[in-house]
Amino acid sequence: MDIIEELRAYREKDIPYSRVLSSMCTVPHPVAVEAHRMFIETNLGDPGIFRGTVELEAKLMRLIGDILHCETPAGYICSGGTEANIQGIRAARNVQKKENPNIVIPKTAHFSFEKIGDILGVKIKRAGVDEEYKVDVGQVEDLMDENTVAIVGIAGTTELGQIDPIVELSKLAEERQVELHVDAAFGGLVIPFMDNPYPFDFQNRGVSSITIDPHKMGMATIPAGGIIFRNESYLRALEVETPYLTSKTQFTLTGTRPGTGVASAYAVLKSLGFEGMREVVKNCLKNTRILVEEMRDLGFEPVIEPVMNVVSFRTDEAERIKEELYRMRWVISTIREPKAIRFVVMPHVTEEVIKNFISDFRKVLRR
């Protein structure tokens, strides 16, 4: 067998995005693919060699900074939301310099914070949520103590797409003089382009850092996560010496770092512009409403009215439904609390995809 044929055979075992209604990633935009090819051999881990790519990343940081209302953005493109969350909390720990550091997170926070506790030696405290699944700010405050280095808010929770009360968390962070990290891995490139955007970003003075992933709603090629700090002082807190490279210090978590994510993210945001991104988000929200209407017709109610293009529907048969759909090569996910089936309506989830899905979903319900 020819090696390319062998590769194709393996690739064909993958499920195409047209059958995937659970992923927060999507088919890359054509301009992202073109940019990826152009920068395929670049390594931002050696900035003295790839000077143009370094300059491009700086431009991308300013572009994202504009979206997030930050005049002095400092950060970089990384592997994804997990790495970005690690770096946000690592910077907070290093800046705060407390002996037995802890952070307070919502119980709805991404599982990457489990890894953060293990890797950074930071104690994780979990605050409960209200009836709308937003973090309870009162509980956050009660859990804080003299060793708290950061509190965390989510702008687009993984399971429900909910936005925590970042404005109130920001005021609390300022009052208690701790850092506020906002995990907007998903919502960071959704909320700014909505009709009535919630102020989740650096316009709140207490926000220190934001996770934002262009390889999600930014339609960049994978990997293209992002961590953005309010200013460079947080990057300085992450630096280690790199004596044998073309730069003396490095603030990133990984050494070797592809420039493809930078190029593809910049290409999409620059070519589409603000209005183009608004159109992408508008279309995803429209299709989310279509999905909700179809599911309601079948007797399924959303856990909460969708805030963005993530929606979960209550059912005690979540696991059975997921497994039967998977046998039909449809991919959805489930959540445990409350029991529900979960959907993410990405750009590839078109009205036609929803129609095809509902047709097969009806067959599952008849079994």
Swiss-Prot record:
Coiled coil: none
Pathway: Cofactor biosynthesis; coenzyme A biosynthesis
Entry-linked InterPro entries: GrpII_AminoAcid_Decarb, MfnA, PyrdxlP-dep_de-COase, PyrdxlP-dep_Trfase, PyrdxlP-dep_Trfase_major, PyrdxlP-dep_Trfase_small, Pyridoxal-P_BS
Lyase among keywords: yes
Superkingdom as given in the UniProt entry: Archaea
Modification N6-(pyridoxal phosphate)lysine, positions: 216
A matching Pfam family: Pyridoxal_deC
PROSITE patterns hit by this protein: DDC_GAD_HDC_YDC (PS00392)
HAMAP family cross-referenced by the UniProt entry: MfnA_decarbox (MF_01610)
Family named by the database record: Belongs to the group II decarboxylase family. MfnA subfamily.
Protein name: Probable L-aspartate decarboxylase
Gene: mfnA
